[in-house]
Amino acid sequence: MVTAPPEIRSLNGTLRVSLSLRSASGAGGETRYCYVDEHGNLNPTLRLKPGDLLVLKLKNDLSSVPGTMNRRDPPKRDPCASWKMQIASTNLHFHGLMVPPVCHQDDVLNTTLLPQSPAYEYRVRIPANQPPGLYWYHPHPHGHSEEQVLGGASGALIIEGVERFNASVVGLPERLLIFRDQARANAAPVDGRKAPSKDLSVNFVPVPFPDYEPAIIKIKPLQRELWRVLNASADTFVDVHLLTNGRWQNLGLVSVDGVPLRYEQNESKASADGDSTEWVPNVLIPPGGRAEFLYDSPAEGGWTQLLAAGVDTVPVQDEDTPGFVALPGFTPADDDDYTPPRWMVKITARADAPLPASVLPKTVSSVRALLAPLASVYPTRTRKLYFSEKVMDAKNPRGSTVFYLTEEGHVPTAFDPSAAPNITVRQGEVEDWIIENRSQEVHTFHIHQTHFVLLERDKEAVKENYLRDSVDVPYWDGLSKQYPSVKLRIDFRGAAVVGTFPYHCHILQHEDGGMMGTIQVLAAGEKRSK
């Protein structure tokens, strides 16, 4: 049975919580990770309002990973100082929040907590103009992010107020679903069925291979709810479809990556008299992405199944396909990461089902004026970046791979934490970035501290009424004359972006493998260093 994660809400403008990151060995020998608060709650959901202060004390209590045993004295070092990330080190990223990339707020480049270090305090002021919606927190120690997120270290962070931007959600019950992936100890086929590269869970209810027994939710009949769905997977895409009583059901899309649809169009007053919902057949959520949508339950005794559809992450062609060009190290889809379709959740309509504990307000407050819509702002400049990969030993395609995210005109180089920022811009600017995928597996572009609007896919205009912080870029199929690409308009107007922060592939195996760069945003009057 799927249950809601424990919640902690802000009180009188402040949310205070102490989290301990702990580890333990799983049944298959894997290391599991979890945040535990002072009351014993696991991976609690943090709920705040725009303008609130988050005071979070984080303690690194890892004990079941290499490098954490036999330490007697706490390490004497400044956790804010640049430090080589280790498998036993950790930090915290507030994914999607528009807060400064500095020590004690949202810095992941220099902040490193080692086991037995004193508790480290984050003090994060939620901006008054932070879009209301679903965000999340997770560890971000470069080189070891995948290990900790794949092990389960993540939690939701909800900024209240979505009802101010969409009349259709006012007063609705809300339900939070968190998808997480987990490495499989045994990848052997069963009865001729290929095992997925990773299993998935819903709110820590496992839906494992080979039976994929779905998690269960009971819901009131003919009930509309706002579902907040977080893909907290390290590496796995979740393509959400709903099948109700044998027929496909549309989703009422309300928000993407924490931002309500048409958010920028609500400049001076609440939209409680307007419905910005878009009804769609499915929603593809990349690793780290979020989607919030309306779900209408069936009548008494009816059922809905939530399908995580299969996602092709590499070309289905092989070397025998006419005209196909295989890059060094390419392996066919059947031999690579495998993401099959899975029935993840079965929802049954029962009159005795409890309502979710969280219900959106029935009254709506005013909305602050916003900046000009991003898509309408003329960009300061345009850049092109591209994803690429290099297998270290071409004779061993299963060997070590280095991942790159490179600005056009520069030599591909794996992320180096000691290097100067790859890109420098000035606060107040807006840039267009074209992101190409020159590799033969899918990637997900993510940038910290800000959002962007998707303008084009493969040079074709896209009309989206929402902002994002992550977007998928499909693989090059080995046949097309042009690489898959997206064109993004990225917002550097907000004051919180000043500083240095990363952009990277949010498939964390790739990010850990070097597919990351840094951008320095100078204050409006600050001079560029020579």
Cite the ranges covered by each PLM segment.
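Short, surface-exposed loop/turn segments at beta-strand-coil junctions that are enriched for proline
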Residues: 125-131, 296-302, 493-498
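Active-site pocket scaffolds in enzymes
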Residues: 28, 79-114, 249-281, 325-328, ...
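Histidine- and aromatic-rich segments of cupredoxin/plastocyanin-like copper-binding domains
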Residues: 99-115, 183-363, 460-462
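Extracytoplasmic/periplasmic copper-protein system
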Residues: 7-9, 155-172, 178, 330-335, ...
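N-terminal, post-signal-peptide metal-ligating segments of extracellular/periplasmic oxidoreductases
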Residues: 1-114, 119-121, 192-227, 232, ...
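Hydrophobic or amphipathic alpha-helical targeting/insertion segments
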Residues: 127-165
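Short strand-edge motifs at loop-to-beta-strand transitions and within beta-strands
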Residues: 118-124, 215, 281, 289-293, ...
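Short acidic/polar inter-strand loop motif in beta-rich domains
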Residues: 143-149, 310-321, 509-515
